[in-house]
Amino acid sequence: MAIQIILNFILAFIWIFLSGSYTLNNLLLGFILGLGFVYLFSRILPGRFYFIKIYKILKLAVVFFVELLKANIDVLKIVLQPKLKNEPGFFVYHTDLKTDWQIVLLSNLITLTPGTVVLGISDDRKKIYIHSIDFSTKEEEVEGIKSSLEKVVREVGED
């Protein structure tokens, strides 16, 4: 993947030097042309086409920011209520992620969303212990994490 990125930037700079126009637009055009060239030769270059990984990382960022916005609104509703009706609770989340960095990334994303804190990870790396500020049902919490954050973390980790 690193070879493909370096090759893409080299092709972009070659394009700038050959065209003689040293503008940002020309650099962007050279980058896009280089991206097409790298895509055409991705079968003979080592690794998968790198732009797919970048797309997955951007998708992870978008999903996280959507979850962050939803969690902020939920916590704001709890805080602005005249009488607190939230039910905090602990639960165990069973994850299917395999690598340590994926589990740590998921744990950090869960902790960064307001209203949830990861307390720990089991020794077998299969369970994540979570505290939620408003714990309605375990199934809702687990499904929310599994369908959004864990799904995109798994996609980023796939080769």
From Swiss-Prot:
One of its GO terms (cellular component) is plasma membrane. It is a multi-pass membrane protein. GO terms for molecular function: antiporter activity; monoatomic cation transmembrane transporter activity. The keyword Transmembrane applies. It is found in: Cell membrane. The chain crosses the membrane at residues 1-21, 27-47, 49-69, 101-121. Keywords: Antiport, Cell membrane, Hydrogen ion transport, Ion transport, Membrane, Sodium, Sodium transport, Transmembrane, Transmembrane helix, Transport. InterPro entries: Cation_antiport_E (IPR002758). GO terms for biological process: proton transmembrane transport; sodium ion transport. The keyword Nucleus does not apply. May form a heterooligomeric complex that consists of seven subunits: mnhA1, mnhB1, mnhC1, mnhD1, mnhE1, mnhF1 and mnhG1. NCBIfam families: PRK12651.1-1 (NF009291). Mnh complex is a Na(+)/H(+) antiporter involved in Na(+) excretion. Belongs to the CPA3 antiporters (TC 2.A.63) subunit E family. This is Na(+)/H(+) antiporter subunit E1. It comes from Staphylococcus haemolyticus (strain JCSC1435).
